[in-house]
Amino acid sequence: MYSYHDRVSYSRIDKDGLLGVSDTVNAMQDCCLFHSEDVGHSALDLLKKNRAWLVSAWHVVFKRRPVMGERFTVHTWPYQFKGIFGCRNFLMETPDKEVLAYADSRWFYFDPSTGQPTKIDDSEKAAYPTEPAYDMEYSSRKVKCPENLTLVEEVDVCQNYLDTNHHVNNGQYIRLAVNVLPIDFEVSEFRAEFRLAAKMGDTMYIRTTSENGKFYVVFTDLSLIHI
């Protein structure tokens, strides 16, 4: 297990003074990337070898979002490698071990030079010893969405949406999805499926609907987010 200590900063809180939903995902992503840095397999080093990890799905459950100034720790560990896929858990908790959030994430190993997934290198798997999966509900990577969607926004991809893979970072989709939810809607859990990465100059057409108390946000032809 790898752990990273953090504190809620003002730049990451929402209107209620809580760590934002997308900022929670970013904190988990940061922990994962620090893990890679500290075992000598950083994202930038992988790119030099024409390799990268891309996320294909998130399932995040919130127990409580921490408030401005509150300290917290994010833990992460992989629990499975198979073929091109890797699965990784996250746990966010207070210094007193109160669970704030936990997550499952699915990733695939990628060759940027070909634009195709590729088998995980043995050295990559060896750098991340697996541990038992977290005790949570595990769902399918794919999210089923109703068809009665309403177009609510068009977003042009600009530079500050991109990460080092030159794609829109997964946290940006989460942020944009939350922005089109009812203003007082509290996200207690979400699932996100990423199908195709948006790039600089693309236009994302955001459509929404709700059904049985669940909100669905779809980035047309790019990714599907279920909140």
Task: Report the location of each language-model feature.
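Conserved small/polar residues in nucleotide/adenosyl-binding loops
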Residues: 225-227
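Hot-dog-fold acyl-thioester-processing enzymes
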Residues: 1-55, 102-104, 110-185
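Glycine-rich acetyl-CoA-binding "A-motif" of GNAT/NAT acetyltransferases
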Residues: 99
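Generic intrinsically disordered, low-complexity segments enriched for polar/acidic and small residues
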Residues: 7, 87, 107, 170, ...
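Hydrophobic beta-sheet segments that form the core/acyl-binding groove
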Residues: 60-95, 189-222
